[in-house]
């Protein structure tokens, strides 16, 4: 039995909307990493809702626009000290790479996770970082935003030591 054309159109429109939403959420995650990698920390809070929340374990917490601005403001570059361009958390360089972004949608809300590899210089030393981002998303005024972003570290260790040790979280302590 052939499907009603109007019903088929509605079904296809819903599928296109879901694909568009998934792509917009991927773009949101990609923009976050672009801003980190390019040092555009002041732009990051705009990726969150006004009451957005950040939980980066021992690296810090922030809730609401004022706290998000303060948190990412701490990452803004400070004047060079002794020839090195340092930031207030002790990170003078960072490049992040994400993998396996999984998204679950329910209308104008969603959750997702992705895996992180990062190469920061922390307090003058090269580090290796592996972690998982756990996100909550919400669509507001046609745009997807982070409602909550969590970071679950797997390891944060000096490059010279590697991660084959019991204490795998050495950055930010």
Language-model segments: residues:
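A short, glycine-centered helix-capping/turn motif at helix boundaries
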Residues: 37-40, 140
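A solvent-exposed, acidic/Ser-Thr-rich amphipathic alpha-helical stretch
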Residues: 41-115
């Amino acid at each position: 039995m052939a499907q009603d054309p109007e019903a088929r159109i509605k079904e296809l429109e819903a599928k296109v909307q879901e694909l568009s939403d998934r792509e917009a959420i991927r773009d949101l995650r990609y923009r976050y990493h672009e801003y980190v990698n390019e040092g555009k920390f002041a732009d990051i809070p705009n990726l969150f809702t006004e009451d957005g929340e950040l939980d980066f374990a021992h690296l810090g917490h922030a809730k609401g626009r004022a706290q998000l601005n303060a948190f990412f403001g701490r990452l803004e570059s400070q004047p060079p000290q002794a020839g090195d361009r340092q930031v207030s958390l002790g990170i003078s360089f960072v490049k992040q790479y994400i993998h396996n972004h999984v998204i679950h949608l329910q209308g104008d809300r969603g959750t997702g996770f992705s895996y992180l590899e990062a190469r920061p210089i922390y307090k003058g030393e090269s580090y290796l970082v592996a972690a998982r981002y756990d996100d909550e998303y919400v669509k507001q005024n046609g745009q997807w935003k982070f409602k909550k972003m969590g970071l679950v570290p797997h390891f944060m260790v000096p490059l010279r030591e590697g991660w084959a040790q019991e204490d795998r979280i050495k950055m930010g302590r």
